[in-house]
Amino acid sequence: MLSAIIDYKERLLAAKRFVIVACGTSWHAALIGKHLIESFCRIPVEVEYASEFRYRDPVIHEDDVVIAISQSGETADTLAAIELAKEKGAFIYGICNAVGSSIPRITDTGSYIHVGPEIGVASTKAFTGQVTVLTMLALTLAKEKGSMTDEKYLEVIRELTAVSYTHLRAHETSQDL
């Protein structure tokens, strides 16, 4: 997950702006990503519905990073948004669950969330995986950029660890009921 961020950190840190394109549940994960990247990295972020992005003439520059998020890696609107952003010279970072799908093949780099198949309409595993990747992206870039102190970085990591333990305890308690 982090290798794509570390391998392309110079390009990611050089971004004047991030634009996140997604649909459905992935769009909701993108809203959290916007908050994290802006708060931790101090880089402006726009979140766009891929279905709207593709039908207008978005202002995209070569120093923009476009993050494309899709559980399936085959969302037609997100694929079209990627192609449009590539034509305008943006660097494309994909976040996807499906290994070998179209989105990872056409982006410059990216991360898989590896959460397995989603059963049902509510895409809870994919949402959690997407937010996790966006969190790691924001934390890694903030640390590299120096926009977050080491103390704050460690505090956030400790808080995230505590969330995992709290979830596990709640799960164990619910199993006992």
Spans of model-derived segments:
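Conserved small/polar residues in nucleotide/adenosyl-binding loops
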Residues: 166-173
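An N-terminal, well-structured beta->alpha segment
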Residues: 1-16
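Cationic, low-complexity basic patches in intrinsically disordered or flexible, solvent-exposed regions
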Residues: 176
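Glycine-rich phosphate-binding loops that contact phosphosugars or nucleotide phosphates
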Residues: 13-162
